[in-house]
Amino acid sequence: MNLGKESEVLEFKESTSELHSAIESIASILNKHDYGEIYFGVYDNGEPKGQIVTDSTIKKISDSILRDIEPRIIPTITEISIEGKSIIKVSFSGKNKPYSAFGKFLVRVGTQNRHMTREELKKLFLDSDYSYP
């Protein structure tokens, strides 16, 4: 079962070895949208690869999200099975823009994360109702 294509609110990671990049994607997605999902154990083309899932794996993801994204968000992290392969699904939402990851302010453009311009960041800080175009 293919999970589809990556988008502005959906990202696939082959494993939790890409956790740093996933954290950046979460902040980036939230700076443009109010919600998103990251899947660990899925190829970029949406095909399931599988991921070893333990309590410490889930804790590592949760701890990084709580520690490295400001302001803090509380994600939903679940293990799902697709074609007999374990996948980690991280669902998140937040409306307290702007969000930073590792002290960097990023925004999602298509399937890529890019640094916000000074003007974009200024608008987000000054106008809490600002919605990225």
Language model: regions and residue ranges:
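Conserved N-terminal catalytic/coupling substructures associated with nucleotide/phosphate chemistry
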Residues: M1-P133
